[in-house]
């Protein structure tokens, strides 16, 4: 069994997703569009598809984004699981006909998200469904719900934080982060964040980094449960 991972930016690699897959003996291939990798022509040899984040908008005129959407629809038609992190989640929404647009407010840094109750949420979140969890955000856009999708996570800043549909989970938040990835983001994003001082839902780099010790473990615990379901679906 192999998983295809689509990477949109060289600074936004698989991180904890790759660590988790390796730990559980799951093979995967990473297609880094930022390094001019071509996407897989088909998902025929893959059991599932994972999409990572990136600084671009789903609405940008980039061939890699349209190719990603095509692969998402192929996975849907084949009943294969798909998981999307931030831009990856927005690509799922767009591929399924939902609107992706600039959010009312950027959301950057550590936040709380409320995981829904119900069977779809429980499938992905298990015992965490119905509770608040820590999550790392870094997004300017937001998605609406595609037809037939179920809202499974939200908060006051971004009411649609995640949805489930067709063996797919689309998330605005970043469960794939690890310490190294987030520390690099905080370090490299200082100027970006400084330009957003005064925005009510944007943490500055120092605050993001300072909260890693107390927040990362909870993020990984949620990621563990989500990735377990992703691979469970890939094996069926």
Give names to the regions the model predicted.
Residues 1-80, 197-236:
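N-terminal beta1-alpha1 cap of cysteine-dependent amidohydrolase-like domains
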Residues 18-20, 46, 63-66, 97-100, ...:
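Short, glycine/charged-enriched secondary-structure capping and boundary segments
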Residues 74-99:
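Catalytic nucleophile loop
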Residues 96-181:
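Pocket-forming structural segment of enzyme catalytic cores
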Residues 166, 175-212:
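C-terminal helical/coil "lid" or tail adjacent to the Rossmann-like core of SAM-dependent
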